[in-house]
Design a protein with these regions (language model features):
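Catalytic-core signal marking the mid-to-C-terminal active-site face
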Residues: 165-362
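Internal glycine-rich alpha/beta core junctions
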Residues: 11-14, 18, 42-202
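Hydrophobic face of alpha-helices
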Residues: 3-6, 10-13, 17, 54, ...
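Short glycine-/small-residue-rich flexible loop motifs, especially phosphate/cofactor-binding loops
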Residues: 21, 102, 264
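Amphipathic alpha-helical coiled-coil segments and their boundaries
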Residues: 2, 6, 50, 122, ...
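Short, well-ordered beta-strand elements within core beta-sheets of diverse protein domains
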Residues: 4-5, 48, 127-135, 262-270
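Long, non-coiled-coil amphipathic alpha-helical linker/lever segments
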Residues: 1-42, 109-125, 207-212
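Long, hydrophobic, amphipathic alpha-helical segments used as structural scaffolds
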Residues: 13, 17-31, 35, 61, ...
Length: 362
């Protein structure tokens, strides 16, 4: 049953990856402000950021495929795993007994049975399976966190129905309810993975029954939750709304600071003193930052630099350094390479399961 359930999870996971691939490709050239420590950092692109989400789901897919490929059955070995009853049944015929487990495995569509066991299969199997689900949940949670933060910034939003109510008191609100639900369920699955680990660790000898009730709760509930999580992810990715103008506005407000290295190099090439220019940029950057933070003004760093004769650069010259594409490095190229070399071959090999959609009621 767990094997069949993992196959269903795999199908939905592939569809989430496929939708993310479309989103990444469509937005691979759209520059956006990157964040480290949630502080402005060197720009990336919207599509490149999506590949980070996708890569983690791809890692989950690899782990899932490995576990699926190594799943085995318990077989039939008796009350303590010694096959003692079969010795009696087959009059000690070892060759006949050796054929039993391979026949069971073939009948059930597995490659093999576990060579040794107690009364049950090792509960470590449940641990491996729930760890796969927990890994997917962790990837989904990270994705949902980023969407929630981006929605706060008004750069990217999850789908929002025309009749959806964001807040019972504040009618104007557009709360990221789907992403919040992903986070909530994901935390449950990640914690749920502790159950089979503890059960496996606390089994006595050939078997104790304290595994049973816990397993009957933790395993099916983990699968039910991850099924809902993947439906939510599929729905969110399929309906993501990007606001390029907001993204551009925020990027341009920070870009003058990030362009200072290029500005300084251009000024040095024109005959300026590097040490002097470095100190002036430091001082002017502090003035511009103070204007933005303390007085709520626009970033006027370029105007301050243009007014300083040490740089010998006009505002028009400085504006030429403001092309965001100059600061995104190989982001778009990385997206193309990642899709071509990593994602698309997997999607092509599994194209018969693609095309799923998910409808969510909020």
């Amino acid at each position: 049953v767990m094997t069949e359930a993992l196959k269903l999870v795999r199908k939905k996971l592939l569809n989430v990856i496929a939708e993310l691939a479309k989103f990444a490709d469509a937005n691979k050239n759209l520059p956006t402000l990157a964040f480290t420590h949630f502080q402005p950092a060197q720009p990336t692109t919207v599509g490149k950021r999506a590949t980070l989400w996708m890569q983690e789901f791809m890692m989950d897919l690899e782990d899932l495929d490995y576990v699926l490929s190594t799943m085995k059955l318990l077989g039939s070995k008796g009350t303590t795993g010694t096959q003692a009853s079969f010795l009696e049944l087959f009059d000690g015929d070892q060759e006949t007994i050796d054929k039993i487990d391979p026949m069971i495995a073939e009948k059930m569509g597995f490659k093999a049975c576990y060579p040794v066991s107690g009364q049950t299969y090792s509960r470590k199997v449940d641990t491996r399976v729930l760890n796969i689900l927990a890994g997917i949940a962790a990837s989904a949670h990270k994705f949902s966190n980023d969407i929630r933060l981006l929605q706060h910034l008004k750069e990217v939003e999850e789908p929002f129905e025309k009749s959806q109510i964001g807040s019972s008191a504040m009618a104007y609100k557009r709360n990221p309810m789907r992403s919040e639900r992903i986070a909530s369920l994901s935390r449950f699955v990640m914690v749920d993975a502790l159950n089979p680990a503890i059960t496996s660790a606390t089994q006595w000898f050939e078997r104790t029954l304290d595994d049973s009730a816990n397993k009957r709760l933790s395993v099916p509930e983990g699968f039910l939750a991850i099924d809902g999580i993947l439906d939510l992810c599929l729905n969110v990715v399929d309906g993501l709304v990007v606001y390029p103008k907001v993204i551009e506005k925020r990027l341009r407000s920070e870009l003058p600071f990030m362009a200072t290295e290029n500005i300084m190099m251009d000024a040095v090439k024109a005959g300026g003193d590097r040490q002097e220019l470095h100190e002036k940029i430091r001082e002017l950057s502090m003035v511009a930052a103070r204007n933005v933070k303390a007085e709520g003004k626009e970033n006027n760093l370029l105007e301050l630099i243009a007014a300083d004769p040490a740089f010998n650069m006009s505002l028009e010259d400085l504006e030429k350094t403001m092309d965001p594409a100059k600061y995104t490095g190989r982001a778009s190229v990385q997206v193309d390479a990642f899709l071509k070399n990593v994602v698309n071959p997997v999607l092509e090999a599994n194209k018969e399961v693609l095309g799923m959609t998910a409808e969510i009621n909020v």
